[in-house]
């Protein structure tokens, strides 16, 4: 999504807002297809990774396939929430995800300034232990409160944030950006180019604290990268770490770099990676030049070694890039972490991203052997199974429709959001920008759900909502409730988590959180707990919202 991390740090963050819709809002319908309709609870799921703590929530984007799908039920209805009555903890300014641990009673809170161990049993959300990241100063509750206070102007907000975080607040995003918890309850995160794993001092008594178990500085091994951008765990128990200019594989103990792979010199990586149960590692990099082609690759990672040989199943395929986009979109290629689609006995096995075009396209690649009967899409690599220009129901005159979010996948359906809006406000820092979105700076609108037609091997639009927008949080879908959730700003009522029906796009759920910026999700992912409570990973720390 970005040209380089230095460029990312210098570029502006775009503004977005959500105009929430009433429950009887009707989406624009798409064409039908011949794919058999089944409930999301019935569709094939990614194979559980035996090296992760749980099947769901133990890695960013919820599973190794990065589908952003969870199995818990969420209520229909409209809920007005008083945040002052909610249980919350303090950390930030980015709390990307709260990870499932090996115990259903506890979760790991993963932040840009610390790691926490949270007791979620019996309806609680209580921090029982915490530890700072190497070289990072933990923010105080007072500082985080000031960051989320009400401000009349962008300049006023900017001054406060820089006073707290320094002259380049978005540098904090280089920490804790992709995280996971393994089967032995080690939590992995990063502080810049240092990869770290944590454990409990006493697994039988979490209140005794968190120990930094091991760390490894990767600066000399990342091919001159500025920062790390992703991490995953292979199905045979090796840690794969993505940097801007290459990929590394390490042992879980973080004592050995087992292998490395350098990206082509014209490519840069700023999104994370996903992996399948057979060692297929999917990497979507971007061109370093405007309009240049991005590169989707499948590497093979087995026994701690990379292979780029087609004989082992590896492949490469170029996809469309684009010009420099307005903020929030940065760089010239995809803003998506690759997402797998099709599992088990499903007919088609795909990996999907959005491309870098001004009006983005949803691109599906055959991730294994290309079917013998597959027709090549005109003008594209034969590895590309299908291409769909996303409209989000917006007028044909809309210049930019682009996304910084991963594609949400359930069955053969894919959900995307538009993150681009041209604004007169100059925004030169992503953290300042994301805190300004909604309350101070107006943002874009538009979501769309698209289906892969397995009979005709093509994308078809199911529905679109031009009146709904996701601000910066990663959307997520409940397979049991068949709702996809976004978070955005409503000028009348403030921050809101909105649930849209997966089949029709109609609004079914509204959690109205109010106008306090404590309810700003700042790049985090939307999560729900087993009992249906919202686990809201806000800019100042996780909040448990009960219904």
Where are these regions (language model features)?
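Bacterial Sec-dependent N-terminal signal peptides
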Residues: 16-35
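Beta-strand-rich domains and repeat architectures in extracellular enzymes and scaffolds
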Residues: 39-118, 171-184
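Surface-exposed loop and turn segments in beta-propeller and other repeat-based domains
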Residues: 71-86, 129-168, 211-224, 264-265, ...
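Repeated scaffold domains used in trafficking and secretory/extracellular systems
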Residues: 90-100, 135-149, 164-181, 219-232, ...
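Blade-level signature of beta-propeller repeat domains, shared across WD40, Kelch, NHL, RCC1
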Residues: 520-547
């Amino acid at each position: 999504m970005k040209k380089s991390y230095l460029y990312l740090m210098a570029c502006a963050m775009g503004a977005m807002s959500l105009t929430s819709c009433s429950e009887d809002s009707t989406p624009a319908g798409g064409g039908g297809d011949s794919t058999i309709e089944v409930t999301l609870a019935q569709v094939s799921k990614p194979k559980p990774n035996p090296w992760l703590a749980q099947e769901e929530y133990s890695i960013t984007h919820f599973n190794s396939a990065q589908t952003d799908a969870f199995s818990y039920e969420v209520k229909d209805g409209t809920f007005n929430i008083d945040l002052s009555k909610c249980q919350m903890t303090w950390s930030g300014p980015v709390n990307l995800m709260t990870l499932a641990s090996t115990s259903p009673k506890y979760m790991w809170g993963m932040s840009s300034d610390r790691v926490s161990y949270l007791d979620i049993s019996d309806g609680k959300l209580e921090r029982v232990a915490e530890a700072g990241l190497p070289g990072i100063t933990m923010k105080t509750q007072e500082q985080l409160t000031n960051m989320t206070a009400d401000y009349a102007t962008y300049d006023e907000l900017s001054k406060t944030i820089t006073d707290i975080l320094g002259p380049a607040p978005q540098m904090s995003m280089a920490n804790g950006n992709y995280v996971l918890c393994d089967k032995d309850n080690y939590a992995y995160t990063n502080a810049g180019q240092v990869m770290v794993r944590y454990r409990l001092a006493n697994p039988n008594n979490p209140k005794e604290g968190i120990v930094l178990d091991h760390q490894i500085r990767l600066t000399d091994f990342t091919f001159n990268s500025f920062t790390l951008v992703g991490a995953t765990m292979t199905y045979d128990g090796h840690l794969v770490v993505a940097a801007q200019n290459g990929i590394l594989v390490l042992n879980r103990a973080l004592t050995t770099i087992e292998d490395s792979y350098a990206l082509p010199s014209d490519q840069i990586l700023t999104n994370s990676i996903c992996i399948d149960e057979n060692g297929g590692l999917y990497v979507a990099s971007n061109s370093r030049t405007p309009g240049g082609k991005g590169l989707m690759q499948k590497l093979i990672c087995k026994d701690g070694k990379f292979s780029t040989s087609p004989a082992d199943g590896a492949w490469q395929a170029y996809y469309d890039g684009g010009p420099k986009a307005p903020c929030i979109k940065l760089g010239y290629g995809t803003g998506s972490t690759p997402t797998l689609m099709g599992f088990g006995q499903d007919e088609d096995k795909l990996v999907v991203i959005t491309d870098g075009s001004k009006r983005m396209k949803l691109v599906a690649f055959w991730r294994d052997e290309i079917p013998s009967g597959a027709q090549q899409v005109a003008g594209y690599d034969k590895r590309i199974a299908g291409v769909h220009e996303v409209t989000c129901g917006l007028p044909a005159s809309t210049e930019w429709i682009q996304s910084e979010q991963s594609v949400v996948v359930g069955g053969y359906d894919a959900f995307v959001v538009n993150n681009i809006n041209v604004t007169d406000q100059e925004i030169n820092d992503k953290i300042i920008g994301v805190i300004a979105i909604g309350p101070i700076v107006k943002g874009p609108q538009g979501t769309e759900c698209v289906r892969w037609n397995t009979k005709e091997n093509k994308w078809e639009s199911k529905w679109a909502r031009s009146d709904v927008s996701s601000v910066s949080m990663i959307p997520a879908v409940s397979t049991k409730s068949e709702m996809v959730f976004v978070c955005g700003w409503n000028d009348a009522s403030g921050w809101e988590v909105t649930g849209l029906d997966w089949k029709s796009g109609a609004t079914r759920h509204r959690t109205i959180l109010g106008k306090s910026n404590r309810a700003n999700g700042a790049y985090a992912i939307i999560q729900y707990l087993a009992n249906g409570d919202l686990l809201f990973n806000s800019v100042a720390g996780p909040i448990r919202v009960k219904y």
